[in-house]
């Protein structure tokens, strides 16, 4: 099914490139973006990154750049490079603050880091860092996750039910406005 969707997207994109008025540079940027999306959907992350970086060199529209930056963040996040992923998600949000999916992904990374800190507390009894320091570190990560999930839910109140539940269960929800 995803192959059908990818082919359909390619056909529609080709038609749009021919029909819509756009400069040669804009069309070329979109072609690189589309090639990046195709490679990413096939799991060819290095190829996808090359295409996205080419698209960034050509793309001038901040809104379109934000989605390219977001997709780069996705690739880094999927490959476990969370600091790079965070960097690209934040760059995307600077250009387009209406990206709840980027806010959600940032929250997921911070939540994961909080869980890792708790796991370190349980596993590494011999390290110099004290248990309460692990707990404080975990709390900081969880608070950051809550901050970004609240922002995502303000933009997309019907999305992220797991985040909504986590905010309620942990007492980190601020208001009922998005529930």
Curated annotation (Swiss-Prot):
Keywords: Chloroplast, Membrane, Photosynthesis, Plastid, Repeat, Thylakoid, TPR repeat. InterPro entries: PSI_Ycf3_assembly, TPR-like_helical_dom_sf, TPR_rpt, Ycf3/AcsC/BcsC/TPR_MFPF. It is found in: Plastid, Chloroplast thylakoid membrane. Essential for the assembly of the photosystem I (PSI) complex. May act as a chaperone-like factor to guide the assembly of the PSI subunits. SUPFAM superfamilies: TPR-like. Its main location: plastid. The keyword Thylakoid applies. The lineage of its organism: Eukaryota, Sar, Stramenopiles, Ochrophyta, Bacillariophyta. It comes from the Eukaryota. NCBIfam families: PRK02603.1. GO terms for cellular component: chloroplast thylakoid membrane. Belongs to the Ycf3 family. This is Photosystem I assembly protein Ycf3. TPR repeats lie at residues 29-62, 66-99, 126-159. One of its GO terms (biological process) is photosynthesis. It is a peripheral membrane protein. The keyword Thylakoid applies. Pfam families: TPR_1, TPR_8.
